[in-house]
Amino acid sequence: MTERTLVLIKPDGVKRQLVGEILSRIERKGLTLAALELKNVSDDLARQHYAEHADKPFFGSLLEFITSGPLVAAIVEGPRAVAAFRQIAGGTDPVEKAVPGTIRGDFALITQDNLVHGSDSPESAAREIALWFPGEATA
């Protein structure tokens, strides 16, 4: 069954010119890019996206980071797309959890500046796709 997930290549990935490398890894895994946009993120969109972190001490720095420059937002499709992308992304902590061979394991050092975001469940993917790509069907 085909599944959809939201992938963000965060401002650090864009600034470091890793967009092509990251998209290539997604496609080499067998996933398909269904939509792709370079965006400057508004404070409102950032707050909605990270709403579950609103009461955490790092929320302000997270908003500052995600709005610090352009990012790439993509809808990625394929069998088990959510789990497949999270596998190639690697653990959230790029040093302690992400293994070499993953995007974060190969290119990131800091937890917040960890290059990519991927939805953590099909339900989150549907919510996030609706937020980042209004009007897109989430089938």
From Swiss-Prot:
Main localization (coarse): cytoplasm
Subcellular localization, as worded in the UniProt entry: Cytoplasm
Catalytic residue positions: H117 (pros-phosphohistidine intermediate)
Keywords (A to Z) from UniProt: ATP-binding, Cytoplasm, Kinase, Magnesium, Metal-binding, Nucleotide metabolism, Nucleotide-binding, Phosphoprotein, Transferase
Catalytic activity: a 2'-deoxyribonucleoside 5'-diphosphate + ATP = a 2'-deoxyribonucleoside 5'-triphosphate + ADP; a ribonucleoside 5'-diphosphate + ATP = a ribonucleoside 5'-triphosphate + ADP
Superkingdom to which the source organism belongs: Bacteria
InterPro entries: NDK-like_dom, NDK-like_dom_sf, Nucleoside_diP_kinase, Nucleoside_diP_kinase_AS
Claim: Magnesium is one of the keywords in the record: yes
Any one Gene Ontology BP term: UTP biosynthetic process
PANTHER family assigned to the protein according to its UniProt record, in alphabetical order: NUCLEOSIDE DIPHOSPHATE KINASE
Assembly and interaction partners: Homotetramer.
Family, as annotated: Belongs to the NDK family.
NCBIfam families: PRK00668.1 (NF001908)
Protein name stated in the entry: Nucleoside diphosphate kinase
UniProt organism field: Mycolicibacterium smegmatis (strain ATCC 700084 / mc(2)155) (Mycobacterium smegmatis)
High-level lineage: Bacteria, Bacillati, Actinomycetota, Actinomycetes, Mycobacteriales
